[in-house]
Swiss-Prot record:
Disulfide bonds: none annotated. InterPro entries: Agmatine_deiminase, Peptidyl-Arg-deiminase_porph. This is Putative agmatine deiminase 2. It comes from Listeria monocytogenes serovar 1/2a (strain ATCC BAA-679 / EGD-e). The keyword Hydrolase applies. GO terms for molecular function: agmatine deiminase activity; protein-arginine deiminase activity. Belongs to the agmatine deiminase family. It catalyses: agmatine + H2O = N-carbamoylputrescine + NH4(+). SUPFAM superfamilies: Pentein. HAMAP family: Agmatine_deimin.
Length: 369
């Protein structure tokens, strides 16, 4: 167990699709008062509901700061493992390890650099050093060897893979000045190919409208299966989201994946604009250097930000009539999985959603034929 030399692509490791079997799921308990209102109490209930829902299908581990351990242990059922781990916030998809597998049944991790979505240029908080240590800690906890790429800034929510050589990301995020400004698009793509074993990288221009992470791909796009994808959509041409989604659709419709397949694209309509209320804004402590939560600001509400569990899809609800439409489409797309909706407004208020707060651990014993 320890840090590896070499490259995953040379060692025969790939990043599996999220729909491939899992060993379990990791999460981090929310608490910071300058991002979560009322000291994180409402968000903790949403996180609890997500964790419990996932735990019905695969084991869940909740990491929690020392100050919150007793509270989290009391709130969460015994079926959920609770482990102390210092952190700066609760978005493990972004700074947890990227897990890789090979066809021999082995697993490895990648420890990327993290700078709170843009560092001192346009990051969302400072410091972020505790978050930047989590990937290594998780690999050591699970006794997984890992590659260290600390000089390359990458969040897990900024990429999606199909497990068969295709990776999708956005230019808005990976080419942002606050991440890897000294690297060209070609150099960034080469790194993605070397570490995820991707044969083809598809670049969307933008992520979801007003996504404060510079347009993470997981809020606008997801793989349902190899060659089949889902895209956040609106028919409202006066909504800025329309042009973004249309542009993404046109790019995908004119691309093939690494296997040469034309994409089957499903449109998952987003809810009507979700705005921060005055009460919600007042519940967040205003601290210099953190992203403000102002009454009337629009949130990046998207049903595409869901978690694919063993035998289930855990997706966000927004108290919108389109909740039902999203449920029905997901049931059609995933006939062999149970579709579970969770009220997720408090997660959304923090800047992300269900996919952002979860990190799956692939089942390394599943060898692809």
């Amino acid at each position: 167990m320890g840090q590896l030399k070499g490259l995953p692509v040379e060692d025969g490791f790939r990043m599996p699709g999220e729909y491939e079997p899992h060993i379990g799921c990791f999460m981090i308990w929310p608490e910071r008062p300058d991002n979560w209102r009322l000291g994180g109490k409402p968000a903790q209930q949403n996180y609890k509901e997500v964790a419990v829902a996932i735990s019905n299908f695969e084991p869940v581990t909740m990491f929690v700061s020392p100050n919150q351990y007793k509270n989290a242990r009391k709130e969460l059922p015994d079926t959920i493992r609770v482990i102390e781990m210092s952190n700066d916030d609760a978005w493990i998809r972004d700074y947890g390890p990227s897990f890789l597998v090979d066809d021999k049944g082995d697993m490895r991790g990648v420890d990327w650099g993290f700078n709170a979505w843009g560092g001192l240029l346009d990051g969302l908080y400072f410091p972020w050093d505790k978050d930047n240590q989590i990937a290594k800690k998780v690999c050591e906890l699970e006794r997984i060897d890992y590659y260290s790429q600390k000089d390359f800034i990458l969040e897990g929510c900024s990429i999606h893979v199909d497990g068969e050589g295709t990776l999708v990301t956005t230019e808005e995020c990976l080419l942002s000045e606050g991440r890897n400004p000294n690297l060209t698009k070609i150099e960034i793509e080469q790194t993605l190919k070397k570490y995820f074993h991707a044969q083809k990288v598809i670049w969307l221009k933008h992520g979801f409208y007003l996504d404060e992470t510079n347009g993470h791909v997981d809020n606008i796009f997801n793989f349902v299966a190899p060659g089949e994808v889902v895209l956040s959509w609106t028919d409202n041409k006066s909504d800025p989201q329309y042009e973004i989604s249309r542009e993404c659709y046109d790019i995908l419709a004119n691309k093939t994946d690494a296997k040469g397949r034309t994409f089957i694209i499903h449109k998952l309509h987003c809810p009507d604009p979700v705005l921060i209320t005055q009460t919600e804004s007042e519940g967040v402590e205003a601290i210099n250097g953190t992203f403000p939560r102002q009454a009337g600001d629009r949130l990046a509400a998207s049903y595409v930000n869901y978690y694919t569990a063993n035998g289930a899809i855990i997706f966000p609800l927004f108290d919108d009539p389109k909740d039902k439409d999203a449920q029905e489409l997901l049931e059609k797309l995933y006939p062999d999985r149970k579709i579970v909706g969770i009220k997720a407004r408090e997660i959304l208020l923090g800047g992300g959603n269900i996919h952002c707060i979860t990190q799956h651990l692939p089942d390394k014993s599943t060898i692809r034929e």
